[in-house]
């Protein structure tokens, strides 16, 4: 997937699911399932409930996403 094809949105972690998946509520109120990107996994970035994150969504499936950034 090319970078310009993805949609980036801000969201908040609602709950942690198995296999490093998270339920994220986006700014517009939609709830999506997201997993951690490879660079975040490699650098051991920990994500907890309530964290503000940036999620990349693909235009093909707007119910799944990838967490690419955790706000401090």
From Swiss-Prot:
Domain S1-like positions: 1-72
Record localization: Cytoplasm
Entry superkingdom: Bacteria
Keyword rRNA-binding found: yes
A GO molecular function held by the record: ribosome binding
Family annotation (SUPFAM superfamilies): Nucleic acid-binding proteins (SSF50249)
Pfam families named in the record: eIF-1a
Primary subcellular site in the record, as a coarse category: cytoplasm
Gene Ontology CC: cytosol
Keywords: Cytoplasm, Initiation factor, Protein biosynthesis, RNA-binding, rRNA-binding
Known function: One of the essential components for the initiation of protein synthesis. Stabilizes the binding of IF-2 and IF-3 on the 30S subunit to which N-formylmethionyl-tRNA(fMet) subsequently binds. Helps modulate mRNA selection, yielding the 30S pre-initiation complex (PIC). Upon addition of the 50S ribosomal subunit IF-1, IF-2 and IF-3 are released leaving the mature 70S translation initiation complex.
NCBIfam families referenced in this protein's UniProt entry, alphabetically: infA
Membership in a protein family: Belongs to the IF-1 family.
Subunit structure: Component of the 30S ribosomal translation pre-initiation complex which assembles on the 30S ribosome in the order IF-2 and IF-3, IF-1 and N-formylmethionyl-tRNA(fMet); mRNA recruitment can occur at any time during PIC assembly.
Protein name: Translation initiation factor IF-1
Lineage, highest ranks first: Bacteria, Pseudomonadati, Pseudomonadota, Gammaproteobacteria, Alteromonadales
